[in-house]
């Protein structure tokens, strides 16, 4: 059975590789066997320096080293990133602010509440999902596991801004499942098993059958 721990590496100081290894050591002591590492601006994504330039993000080399370290402790290290909702650090940049459900989001002053409640990607255009796929592909390459958590939670703004006409036509839940399905199929094609949170899909659980069996 999976005995896991979910580590949110996006709040406050970025945890160092040394500290993350200590987390793995403690997990091994308590016989936990899966660590999910959630990042946003705290990983050095290629071409997204606007998102992480004010931080000390984890590098690809550090992630690979942590993955190998966890494997020696019989811990599966699983990648996890935001792909849909609360993408504050990405969607508040000048280069990618136009991908937000609400325009000019990058001009708004920071607040923790706003960060969590808003900054959902605009699904009515194709540019957002292609960027997200590129981020997924880059991050998943650093892990030995066949699992990937796309999160897809807290999409509170979906259908309320740029995608409202589409939501009025198809329904908000249709927009949600179509977007998540495309990401899941992308992962399955890469040999991965997608995972995501159930807070949104549970409102219409019958839509789950549209997703890949993996």
Which residue ranges define each predicted feature?
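Substrate-binding cleft/loops of secretory-pathway carbohydrate-active enzymes
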Residues: 195-214
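Feature activates predominantly on carbohydrate-active enzymes
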Residues: 1-195
């Amino acid at each position: 059975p999976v005995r896991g721990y979910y580590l949110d590496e996006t709040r406050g100081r970025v945890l160092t590789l040394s500290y993350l290894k200590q987390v793995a050591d403690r997990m091994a002591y308590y016989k936990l066997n899966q660590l999910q590492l959630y990042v946003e601006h705290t990983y050095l994504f290629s071409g997204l320096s606007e998102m992480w330039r004010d931080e000390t993000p984890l590098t690809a080399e550090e992630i690979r080293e942590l993955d190998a370290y966890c494997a020696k402790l019989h811990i599966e290290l699983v990648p996890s990133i935001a792909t849909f909702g609360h993408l504050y650090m990405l969607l508040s940049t000048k280069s990618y602010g136009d991908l937000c459900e609400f325009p000019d989001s990058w001009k708004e002053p920071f607040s923790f509440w706003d960060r969590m409640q808003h900054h959902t990607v605009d699904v009515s255009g194709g540019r957002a999902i292609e960027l997200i796929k590129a981020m997924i592909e880059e991050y998943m390459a650093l892990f030995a596991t066949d699992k990937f958590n796309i999160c897809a939670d807290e999409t509170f703004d979906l259908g309320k801004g740029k995608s409202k006409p589409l939501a009025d036509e198809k329904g908000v839940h249709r927009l949600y499942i179509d977007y998540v399905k495309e990401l899941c199929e992308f992962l399955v094609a890469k040999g991965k098993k997608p995972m995501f949170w159930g807070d949104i899909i549970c409102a219409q659980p019958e839509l789950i059958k549209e997703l890949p069996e993996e």
